[in-house]
Amino acid sequence: GGCCSHPACQNNPDYC
C-alpha cells in the first residue's frame, strides 16, 4: 500500500 503501490513511486524508491 501507500506510495510504493504507484508506478511513479516504484520508479523512485526514495519516495517510498
UniProtKB/Swiss-Prot annotation:
Its main location: secreted. Expressed by the venom duct. GO terms for molecular function: acetylcholine receptor inhibitor activity; ion channel regulator activity; toxin activity. One of its GO terms (cellular component) is extracellular region. The modification Sulfotyrosine is found at Y15. It is found in: Secreted. Disulfide bonds join C3-C9, C4-C16. The keyword DNA-binding does not apply. The keyword Transmembrane helix does not apply. The modification Cysteine amide is found at C16. Keywords: Acetylcholine receptor inhibiting toxin, Amidation, Disulfide bond, Ion channel impairing toxin, Neurotoxin, Postsynaptic neurotoxin, Secreted, Sulfation, Toxin. The cysteine framework is I (CC-C-C). Alpha4/6 pattern. Alpha-conotoxins act on postsynaptic membranes, they bind to the nicotinic acetylcholine receptors (nAChR) and thus inhibit them. This toxin is an antagonist of all rat neuronal alpha-3-beta-2/CHRNA3-CHRNB2, alpha-4-beta-2/CHRNA4-CHRNB2 and alpha-7/CHRNA7 nAChR subtypes. Belongs to the conotoxin A superfamily. This is Alpha-conotoxin TiIA. It comes from Conus tinianus (Variable cone).
